[in-house]
Amino acid sequence: MNQNTQPTNNLKDKKITYNFNKLQKRLRRNVGNAIANFNMIEAGDKVMVCLSGGKDSYTLLDILLNLKLSAPINFDIVAVNLDQKQPGFPEHILPEYLASIGVEYKIVQENTYGIVKEKIPEGKTTCSLCSRLRRGILYRTATELGATKIALGHHRDDMLETLFLNMFYNGKLKSMPPKLISDDAKHIVIRPLAYCKEKDIEKYAEAKQFPIIPCNLCGSQPNLQRQVVKEMLQNWDRQYPGRIETMFSALQNVTPSHLCDTQLFNFKAVKHGEMINGIEGDIAFDKMDIPMTLNIQEEDEKQAYTQNGTIQFKAV
């Protein structure tokens, strides 16, 4: 019995290890490509990774630390958690975890929970105020630490959800930028997980057994608009495999001449007999071959580095 069971267990363990390595390589490649494409991290940067205790920020920190080991440039990482003084928040978990992996960290204690509860009526969503409070505190902390970049754990699915939220409720064609500058131009915010699927992050966090801390202030509130949009996208993904990838590709392939924003494209300049830069004429949906499904292939990770000190991971 034991002799027969041992080979089976070995094969199972090898398969688990293979799948994890494959997943980790994919996340490394996606994060590396995002860093390179948007010039997120440069030589000498001090990257402040905002750690909430959720799967996304744990994965972000872990992958960045992993990439740092083989990066051709020097940059520093400091993890920051904002303890918002939520009732029952396990204050010991993050310090213990961060100390165990040997990363520089800072725990910022601010009673934003009390402010939110005081200002927002019971039953109303707290996300907007909570987000503004957190943002201000994180900007201040970045200045105190001398951080040149602030890294957030938003991923591809978050960006698509924001796109639809803005279309449905704000009348804007606007998503989450992978890189932005604060209103006072003092802080640069980056989202290195911009190319990463939430499914991959969930699997990675489970495999790494991160000590996840659930959010009881905003993310668990019922009937949030974001949750409704998330479920809509998940349903689409089940019914039409590849649709999420196609929609995210659309965020990277914008044709202003085929939209209606006069600030993005000068429609008044369109004249008989003249072709202007940025115009695609009558090339529209009916002239294109639209694939019904995507052929998504996983590629081996290969590293390539530029001369300006920016990390690049080239997928071939």
Swiss-Prot record:
Q: Which UniProt keywords apply?
A: 4Fe-4S, ATP-binding, Cytoplasm, Iron, Iron-sulfur, Magnesium, Metal-binding, Nucleotide-binding, RNA-binding, Transferase, tRNA processing, tRNA-binding
Disulphide linkage map = none
- Provide the catalytic activity annotation: cytidine(32) in tRNA + S-sulfanyl-L-cysteinyl-[cysteine desulfurase] + AH2 + ATP = 2-thiocytidine(32) in tRNA + L-cysteinyl-[cysteine desulfurase] + A + AMP + diphosphate + H(+)
In which residues is [4Fe-4S] cluster bound? 127, 130, 218
Xref: InterPro entries: Rossmann-like_a/b/a_fold, TilS/TtcA_N, tRNA_Cyd_32_2_STrfase, tRNA_thiolation_TtcA_Ctu1
Q: What else is known?
A: The thiolation reaction likely consists of two steps: a first activation step by ATP to form an adenylated intermediate of the target base of tRNA, and a second nucleophilic substitution step of the sulfur (S) atom supplied by the hydrosulfide attached to the Fe-S cluster.
Q: How does it assemble?
A: Homodimer.
Which protein family is named in the record? Answer: Belongs to the TtcA family.
Listed name of the protein? tRNA-cytidine(32) 2-sulfurtransferase
Instruction: Print the organism lineage.
Output: Bacteria, Pseudomonadati, Pseudomonadota, Gammaproteobacteria, Pasteurellales
